[in-house]
Amino acid sequence: MTVDEVVAASLESQLVMASSDSLGLCIFGRGVTDTNVEFVVNAINDAHGTELTEDFYTELGKETLALEYQFNRDAGFTDADDELPEFFYTEPLAPTGKVARFHAPEVNRSLGY
């Protein structure tokens, strides 16, 4: 995968997880719900008589991530606190032999922070 593809996949995953967390969806059912946003949005609409779209889910995730980021900054956390331990970057993971490629400042920039 290219860097742009990794960033896009990571961001999409984080947005869905943040939305699911905000809605209180059970972590054990997320193998189903996190891959089927349309299903979740339709269930919310059916239960509450709303007319939400999948864009709502994406925007909820964006807002949640932004609030979490700001909360952490207000609490005094910095990019240094977001950094993985050094061995993630130096010790290859079997069986692929890959190591982490991105550091906190790069990740946060990709999220728009």
Can you describe what each PLM-predicted range is?
Residues 1-113:
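Extended C-terminal regions of large enzymes
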